[in-house]
Amino acid sequence: MTKTDERKPAIFLLSLGCSKNTVDSERLTAQAVASGLTFTDNVDEADIILINTCGFIKDAKQESIDETLAAIGKKEEGVVREVYVMGCLVELYRKELAEEMPEIDGLFGTRELPEVLAAIGAKYREELFDRRELLTPPHYAFLKIAEGCNRRCSFCSIPKIRGPYVSQPIEQLLREAALLQQQGVKELNLIAQDISVYGYDLYGKSALNDLTLRLSDMGFNWIRLLYAYPLNFPLEVISTMRERPNVCNYIDMPLQHINDRILKSMQRGIGRKATEQLIDDIRQKNPDIRLRTTMIAGYPGETRAEFEELLDFIRQTRFDRLGCFPYRHEEHASAYALEDTVSDEEKEKRVGELMELQEGISASLNRKLEGQTLKVLIDRIEESVAYARTEYDAPEVDNDVIIEIGDEAVEEGDFRQVMIEDSTAYELFGRISG
């Protein structure tokens, strides 16, 4: 592409961080395209670099800074004219970024979409708020049902970054979902910082189940629920999963820990007893459900005995999917006032122990699937190998089903029946049977 001053600028958009950020970038892209702007995947063909940053933990912040410095380098080389930075990192460090990187042409927070668009030569149109240009594969998308968070978890800076919890009205979400369906989306993944309290601010009660039922009626192949908080979780949605074939038997519910002292320090609002009862209730209501969770190892003051309690809990509960992260001492989180007593080396050691335990659990659970025929969604095809997921696996984080397709007529976005022949802790291997 030859750059000229007569045409509108071409944008290179780099979207970092979580799926919530992805949705923000998709909304921005749709608005910009409606104003006649074009986007390119080749930075050397761009006039403008726009980076949607993450500021959640140290590693994510560093990635955002590194990418911004690289973009500034492209500007200094004359490859691009302008560099704009938006998103979570700006919410936390706007002043510092402006002082340390004056080469940035504009800084925008998480709630400044009209301003970002104006800077790159586009116009914000309220009537296009529901429209998105997908950055995911076309067969699945994320539906952000709320913005912000009212929880005050001590390790988390999201409320400071994203502001208070604001639910999107059901009718608006249904319009957005209909547009996604028209684009060919088959799997809809419901996301927020906390889906459990969706609707309280609008309707005075949880509306998560109502929304799920309405979306189910629209005929999506799969509807998946991600990022549930254990406190105030609406159990009726678990029954809906059992009753509605297109609502996946899957819930992602980060628990973070199980020791009562640590949960209290984390300001989670729920203790061990209530957590265990909730898990029992979920599994009794829907025995086919798969439960994903996330844990933190090395929280300030975590003793070896408290960590062993967490290991025992995981051993007993046998989560279907589990991730673990070392505690990061983040200056904008309230736990920053605590002494970071566990060394980085010990944190990594504990993460390794926990994930080794989970690897054994996952391998055992996957072995039970050998010989079964499962419905899968084909995510991508590389040469003669297809990578797929079952309803029990969310995009990007869970098991892959790996299929040697040979001469089979298979396309990305297809649903197929697969006979599982072999497995590892995080992979299933099978052949197409229908």
Curated annotation (Swiss-Prot):
Cofactor(s) for this UniProt protein: [4Fe-4S] cluster
Major enzyme class: transferase
Positions of [4Fe-4S] cluster 1 binding: 18, 54, 88
HAMAP family given in the database record: MTTase_RimO
Record-listed [4Fe-4S] cluster 2 binding positions: 149, 153, 156
Keyword match S-adenosyl-L-methionine: yes
Lineage of the organism: Bacteria, Pseudomonadati, Chlorobiota, Chlorobiia, Chlorobiales
Any one GO molecular-function label of the UniProt entry: protein methylthiotransferase activity
Any GO BP annotation: tRNA modification
Keyword S-adenosyl-L-methionine: yes
Catalytic activity: L-aspartate(89)-[ribosomal protein uS12]-hydrogen + (sulfur carrier)-SH + AH2 + 2 S-adenosyl-L-methionine = 3-methylsulfanyl-L-aspartate(89)-[ribosomal protein uS12]-hydrogen + (sulfur carrier)-H + 5'-deoxyadenosine + L-methionine + A + S-adenosyl-L-homocysteine + 2 H(+)
Record's keyword terms, sorted: 4Fe-4S, Cytoplasm, Iron, Iron-sulfur, Metal-binding, S-adenosyl-L-methionine, Transferase
Domain (TRAM) ranges: 367-434
Cofactor note: Binds 2 [4Fe-4S] clusters. One cluster is coordinated with 3 cysteines and an exchangeable S-adenosyl-L-methionine.
InterPro entries: Elp3/MiaA/NifB-like_rSAM (IPR006638), Methylthiotransferase (IPR005839), Methylthiotransferase_CS (IPR020612), Methylthiotransferase_N (IPR013848), Methylthiotransferase_N_sf (IPR038135), NA-bd_OB-fold (IPR012340), Ribosomal_uS12_MeSTrfase_RimO (IPR005840), rSAM (IPR007197)
Domain (Radical SAM core): residue spans on this chain: 135-364
Gene: rimO
Localization, UniProt: Cytoplasm
Protein's UniProt name: Ribosomal protein uS12 methylthiotransferase RimO
